[in-house]
Amino acid sequence: MALEICVKAAVGAPDHLGDCPFSQRALLTLEEKSLTYKIHLINLSDKPQWFLDISPQGKVPVLKIDDKWVTDSDVIVGILEEKYPDPPLKTPAEFASVGSNIFGTFGTFLKSKDSNDGSEHALLVELEALENHLKSHDGPFIAGERVSAVDLSLAPKLYHLQVALGHFKSWSVPESFPHVHNYMKTLFSLDSFEKTKTEEKYVISGWAPKVNP
């Protein structure tokens, strides 16, 4: 029985994959495990009733597995790892939280209108921590030679960071973080990433209402 997954449709383009990094994380996991799945694009500004019936809070992603609909990307990734253990994607516990604060600090900086509020510095601190991890461990991924769950969580978030900050703030990751640059290049060149990424213009249209409410 094929798996089914509900993910965000693009803002203003409901027939295209949208800009939800948590949806892409789930799709990346499905792709890395070479699983067959059917995708449902959900227009989050006009949610169909059948979707609200399976996801009362109206959140994506939602995965149908064993005739049950499961919400939350953390839960989805855990279930897929348990049911389809090959190839293994579980990240060793000591590396599982690497980069976990990047997305939050990115969002704060992106929406900031005050250049002196410390939000840029907070993001740079997190990127420096990622740089130091990558520098002190054999890569190219967080946990070594093989891609794992932490990479699949970070990849969409770093893509959003690159696209949105480049567009709205003309900002990019400093060249003083060469390992982060190489890591992003490695992630973005994965076949699974190419297949599941949204177009840059939809990342921008997705963030626009949050940047300029």
Curated annotation (Swiss-Prot):
Tagged with keyword Oxidoreductase: yes
A molecular function (GO) term: copper ion binding
Keywords: Cytoplasm, Detoxification, Glutathionylation, Ion channel, Ion transport, Membrane, Mitochondrion, Oxidoreductase, Peroxisome, Plant defense, Stress response, Transferase, Transport, Voltage-gated channel
Active-site annotation: 20
Motif (Copper-binding): 133-137
One of the record's GO cellular component terms: apoplast
Localization in the cell: Mitochondrion; Cytoplasm, Cytosol; Peroxisome; Membrane
InterPro entries, per the entry: DHAR1/2/3/4, Glutathione-S-Trfase_C-like, Glutathione-S-Trfase_C_sf, Glutathione_S-Trfase, Glutathione_S-Trfase_N, Thioredoxin-like_sf
Membrane topology qualifier: Peripheral membrane protein
Protein name: Glutathione S-transferase DHAR1, mitochondrial
Native species: Arabidopsis thaliana
Lineage: Eukaryota, Viridiplantae, Streptophyta, Embryophyta, Tracheophyta
